[in-house]
Design a protein with these regions (language model features):
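Active-site substrate-recognition segment that forms the wall
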Residues: 52-57, 116-122, 237-241, 246-384
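Dinucleotide-binding Rossmann-like beta1-alpha1 core, especially the glycine-rich loop
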Residues: 81-166, 175
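Glycine-rich FAD pyrophosphate-binding loop
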Residues: 55-77
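Conserved beta-strand-loop-beta-strand element in the redox core of flavoprotein oxidoreductases
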Residues: 215-236, 242
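N-terminal Rossmann-like FAD-binding beta1-loop-alpha1 element of flavoenzymes
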Residues: 36-63
Length: 408
């Protein structure tokens, strides 16, 4: 499995409340009312987004549980930059159609919603590769014949001209790709997440954060359904509808029958000198699906975030019953081979930064599905349980839209 993007979306799981637009499963579960008790497990991107959009639609009894306050230390959304683009991940016609709907609505949210608009940066996005195999995979992500906004790049000097002179000094060996001049860029993930949580609270959502009071230890399985959750302090949280949005930790609460695999990616920050920051400001997102990607420096610290491209890491642990699963853990370090990949990317693009020390490093966990499509639906057996998981490294774009609408 190859991660090819990070996107960000905030409407996600509430599309499953009142309409059937994205239904893949129907049931006879009773409809909720505006005053029904709604419980969300997880206050990361999708959990917080779901809470916000439920509150915006008038639901008055919404509670969110998480072992950390927003932004959670282990949330993939607790990050500076996430790519915003409408790129595809499949050749399947039905999946393409759904992705286009989600991407269009999410992008409209980033561009027009007053809550999210301040955090979106329309810098443009380069999508590229440097081998025949990579170019074939790039052909799934980018369809230049369908988008006049794309400019084809084939020569090193074309890549270097994407930024002011002195920024992209590399040789770009073998690189070929397409540059989206507008309608793509990045969002400040952490700030958008915090803003969404604050707005949800203002609208009446109750956030219960910290350990033990916010750490869910089990769902309440009762009468062949899910009726809420139990936290580490022993408190029972009963609900008419439970939303499971626990990110990479979601498999610890439910058997997903090998549909999900928590996978870790690696990222670093490189600090610029104060006098360098203006030169690098507003550069487009530079993404090679075989090498990695990086962004313009953040305004607060003047640091460039860089991610290397690789199949991802797992942490396989065997439980007492013999079950083996990948268990996420927090770590502000990356493996040595990941550092080598980051520095190789910099040598090809910005060699002047290739030997600088990292000011920050982290592994970032996502719940991956086999085809990188989201798993958002009512559970086929537990009809009061709504799943919002399988973000697959690209669910962050959905912060700005209401994906669970219709699933409750």
């Amino acid at each position: 499995m190859n991660r090819t993007s990070h996107s960000f979306d905030f409407h996600s799981v509430t599309d499953f409340l009142n309409n059937n637009r994205f239904h893949t499963h129907q049931s006879n579960v009773m409809a909720v009312t505006k005053s029904s008790s709604l419980l969300i497990v997880g206050a990361g991107t999708w959990g917080t987004s779901t809470a916000l959009h439920l509150a915006r639609r008038g639901y008055t009894n919404v509670t969110v549980l998480d072992p950390y306050p927003v932004p959670s230390a282990i949330s993939a959304g607790n990050d500076v930059n996430k790519i915003i683009s409408s790129g595809q991940y499949t050749n399947n016609k039905d999946e393409i159609e759904i992705n286009e709907i989600l991407a269009e609505e999410a992008f409209n949210g980033w561009k027009n919603d007053p809550l999210f608009k301040p955090y979106y940066h329309d810098t443009g996005l380069l999508m590229s590769a440097c081998s025949q195999e990579g170019l074939e995979r790039l052909g799934v992500r980018v369809r230049p014949g369908e988008d006049p906004n794309l400019v084809e790049l084939t020569r090193p000097e074309q890549f270097r001209k994407l930024a002011p002179e002195g920024v992209l000094q590399g040789d770009f060996p073998g690189w070929k790709g397409y540059f989206a001049r507008s309608g793509a860029g990045w969002a400040h993930a952490r700030n958008a997440l915090v803003a969404a949580a604050r707005e949800a609270q203002r609208l009446g959502v109750k956030f219960v954060a910290g350990t033990p009071q916010g750490r869910v230890v089990t769902l309440i399985f009762e009468n062949n359904d899910v009726k809420g959750a139990v936290t580490a302090d022993g408190k029972i949280w009963r609900a008419e509808r439970t939303f499971l949005c626990a990110g990479a930790s979601v498999s610890q609460f439910l058997d997903f029958m090998n549909q999900l695999r928590p996978t870790a990616w690696t990222l670093v920050h490189v600090a610029l000198k104060p006098e360098e920051r203006a030169l690098y400001k507003n550069i487009p997102v530079i993404f090679n699906i075989e090498r990695g990607f990086f962004f313009e420096p953040d305004e607060e610290r003047g640091e460039i975030k860089i991610c290397d491209e690789h199949p991802g890491y797992t942490n396989m642990v065997q439980s007492a019953d013999g079950t083996v699963m990948s268990i996420p853990f927090e770590k502000t370090q990356i493996p040595k081979e990941a550092e080598a990949r980051v520095r190789a990317l910099l040598k090809e693009t910005m060699p002047q930064l290739a030997d600088r020390p990292f000011s920050f490093a982290r592994i970032c966990w996502c719940a991956d599905t086999a085809n990188r499509e989201f798993l958002i639906d009512r559970h086929p057996q537990y009809h009061s349980l709504v799943l919002g998981c399988g973000a697959s490294g690209r669910g962050k774009t959905l912060t700005s839209r209401d994906v669970t609408r219709g699933k409750s």
